[in-house]
Amino acid sequence: MSTIEQSAKGKKDGDIRYLTPLNIETNKTKKYCRFKKSGIKYIDYKDADFLLKFVNEQGKILPRRLTGTSLKYQRKVSVAVKRARHLALMPYVADLLK
């Protein structure tokens, strides 16, 4: 038997199977809005260190499903990040921000 026939009959351990779904373990814990939890009403656009928690390495604003913030405070975070970018407190685009 040639190696092609053997590989067709028996699958090797290192083969990639595209048709089967990957078993990715996700974090099952519930995410809570840190602003509601601590009672923060105003998000300061001048606090760039705090706003860096809500952007990724490229400088893009992280979505709600990753940060766990509520819709109301996600809008306030996005406005604060955009204001900080406009005043050059935060970069618009970065190669590696963190």
From Swiss-Prot:
UniProt-listed InterPro entries: Ribosomal_bS18, Ribosomal_bS18_sf
GO terms for biological process, alphabetical: translation
Gene3D superfamilies found in the cross-reference section: Ribosomal protein S18
One family name in Pfam for this protein: Ribosomal_S18
Listed GO CC annotations: cytosolic small ribosomal subunit
Keywords assigned: Ribonucleoprotein, Ribosomal protein, RNA-binding, rRNA-binding
Source domain of life: Bacteria
Single Gene Ontology MF annotation: small ribosomal subunit rRNA binding
Subunit composition and interactions: Part of the 30S ribosomal subunit. Forms a tight heterodimer with protein bS6.
Family according to the record: Belongs to the bacterial ribosomal protein bS18 family.
Task of the protein: Binds as a heterodimer with protein bS6 to the central domain of the 16S rRNA, where it helps stabilize the platform of the 30S subunit.
Name under which the protein is recorded: Small ribosomal subunit protein bS18
Organism: Flavobacterium johnsoniae (strain ATCC 17061 / DSM 2064 / JCM 8514 / BCRC 14874 / CCUG 350202 / NBRC 14942 / NCIMB 11054 / UW101) (Cytophaga johnsonae)
Gene name tied to this protein: rpsR
